[in-house]
């Protein structure tokens, strides 16, 4: 790299730090905390009690010189690689949680810039003792667009961006929600093979001006022989979902294949390593969960309750989840609750149709006595809309080319379409509307649900 460019880049980083209005620490799977001198908290392995870790010493800057913005310079792709590429874990009206992991601990920065004003409300040094970073930028402006960037200090001097599959990743941007604005959500399920059908659906959702994505489970399936889970996720999830992961949060629930033994990492499903808990001010404490097995996200008067149906088939955590679900369903602070989980309580599939029984027997009675009008599920590799006692149960699991045939029609079934598809869901103060759209862009179903 030319010495002048090295100088330019370092000086820009100085200006970033000088302009920060909110600075938080670089951490390992934890929420960063606002302070003048950042104090960091490390995600505990088994305990919900946060543990402080030292603040990273920033790289040594070079003497000042007028420079263009670091965001406007094409940083070279360096030798450090993303094991998990920079993605938007969660966004609220005034904050955003970012997550990534490098293949080696590195000195550098993560920075956020306002696209409207050019201001840098968030710039922190990376902790050079850590490769994994989950950081939250606070004091953002609602209804605004921000760019995010990771730059590390290269051995030969200057700054580089991490590489992803021998290429660049991103650029990464996100939009904070304006208070009271209607929601636009994309829903997809069982998009677990990284095939061309999935990438086509992802591209369509990326062009739909969405706030976030809901993934109804089975994130990655069919792991190649001797492949490690990092490589499998890169090829089957991060690469095909890149147009979405670099623009908005993708909220997931675990499916049965997310527990497959061939994708474990350090004795646990890699799913939980890839999707760590994150902070949400309306659900304090959930960022300290040992597993991100069940959690909630809130947007205005709606809460999305994310659940794990594998507890019905031998996975631990059922009793704890049931207690938490009852608490969420009873919360009077929300006008509507939308449960999201992998195995639907009703189905008309030829493939494992009996899987619905424990879900149906346990959760349907609870939903019917709460403010639930709609649930979102996957598992059966099709589109199906079912209804019972004024609740619409949607199966949206046509996220790939692998589709299941229709079996005996369930009494609750209103429509069954064996088509690859995604859902476009719109939610305002009066109605929920969702549209099922196939790979060709044709509407295969559309439903509007009044919010009572």
Language-model region placement:
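Extended active-site neighborhood of metal-dependent phosphoesterases/phosphodiesterases
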Residues: 87, 151-173, 227-333, 353-357, ...
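Short acidic, glycine-rich surface-loop motifs adjacent to enzyme active sites
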Residues: 220-223, 332-350
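Bacterial N-terminal signal peptides that target proteins for export
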Residues: 1-9
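Divalent metal-coordination and catalytic microenvironments
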Residues: 100, 190, 213, 218, ...
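Histidine-centered catalytic micro-motifs
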Residues: 340-346, 375-383
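Conserved, compact domain cores that house catalytic/ligand-binding motifs in diverse enzymes
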Residues: 182-253, 258-259
């Amino acid at each position: 790299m030319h010495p002048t460019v090295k100088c330019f880049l370092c000086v820009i980083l100085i200006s970033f730090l000088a302009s920060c209005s909110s600075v938080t620490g670089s951490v390992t799977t934890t929420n960063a905390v606002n302070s003048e001198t950042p104090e960091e908290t490390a995600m505990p392995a088994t305990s919900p009690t946060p543990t402080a870790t030292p603040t990273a010493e920033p790289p040594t800057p070079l003497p000042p010189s007028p420079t263009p913005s670091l965001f406007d310079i094409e940083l070279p792709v360096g030798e450090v690689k993303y094991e998990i590429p920079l993605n938007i874990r969660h966004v609220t009206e005034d904050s955003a949680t970012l997550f990534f992991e490098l293949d080696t601990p590195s000195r550098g920065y993560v920075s956020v810039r306002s696209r409207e004003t050019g201001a840098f409300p968030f710039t922190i040094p990376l902790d050079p003792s850590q490769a994994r970073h989950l950081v939250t930028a606070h004091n953002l402006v609602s209804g605004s667009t921000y760019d995010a960037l990771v730059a590390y200090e290269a051995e030969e001097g200057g700054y580089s961006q991490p590489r992803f599959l021998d290429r660049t990743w991103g650029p990464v941007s996100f939009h904070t929600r304006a208070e009271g604005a209607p929601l636009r959500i994309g829903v997809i399920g069982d998009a677990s093979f990284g095939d061309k059908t999935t990438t086509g659906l992802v591209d369509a959702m990326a062009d739909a001006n969405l706030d976030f994505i809901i993934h109804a489970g089975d994130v990655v399936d069919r792991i190649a022989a001797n492949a490690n889970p990092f490589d499998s996720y890169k090829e089957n999830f991060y690469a095909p979902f890149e147009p979405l992961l670099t623009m908005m949060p993708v909220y997931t629930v675990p499916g049965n294949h997310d527990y497959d033994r061939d994708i474990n990492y350090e004795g646990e499903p890699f799913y939980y390593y890839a999707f760590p808990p994150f902070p949400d001010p309306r659900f304090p404490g959930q960022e300290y969960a040992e597993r991100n097995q069940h959690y909630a996200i809130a947007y205005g008067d709606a809460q999305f309750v994310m659940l794990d149906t594998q507890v019905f088939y031998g996975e631990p955590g059922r009793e704890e989840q049931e207690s938490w679900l009852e608490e969420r369903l009873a919360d009077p602070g929300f006008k509507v609750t939308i449960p999201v989980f992998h195995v639907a309580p009703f189905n008309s599939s030829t493939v494992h149709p009996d899987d619905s029984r424990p879900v149906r027997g346990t959760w349907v009675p609870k939903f019917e006595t709460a403010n639930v009008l709609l649930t979102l599920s996957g598992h059966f590799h099709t589109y199906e809309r079912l209804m019972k006692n004024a609740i619409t149960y949607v199966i949206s699991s046509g996220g790939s080319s692998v589709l299941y045939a229709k079996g005996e029609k369930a009494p609750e079934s209103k429509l069954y379409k064996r088509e690859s598809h995604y859902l476009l869901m719109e939610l305002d103060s009066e109605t929920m509307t969702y549209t099922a759209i196939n790979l060709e862009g044709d509407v295969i179903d559309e439903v509007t649900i009044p919010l009572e």
